[in-house]
């Protein structure tokens, strides 16, 4: 899922291109607005943390791009390309390492399960 910052910075095409270059196939894409209830459920594990409200506020601040990808070892390939959550720890060449400016505004979410 590409978060609001990606759209604001016009990086959607670049992110999709990087995923396709890894041999993955985009099989679904939808631009949506996440409501506060869905955001709360998505970030439930962080509910008691100090940054929770900022996470919910950011993800609901504009449209996101939900995507479904297909390919060999897809989840592992995507998570490796996405990079560490903290952009200061993300390696150059990863999406977060190259484009993220702030941990909470890390431009992309990648699932760890199908």
Regions found by a protein language model. Give the residues of each.
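Non-catalytic terminal and connector segments of soluble metabolic enzymes
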Residues: 1-114
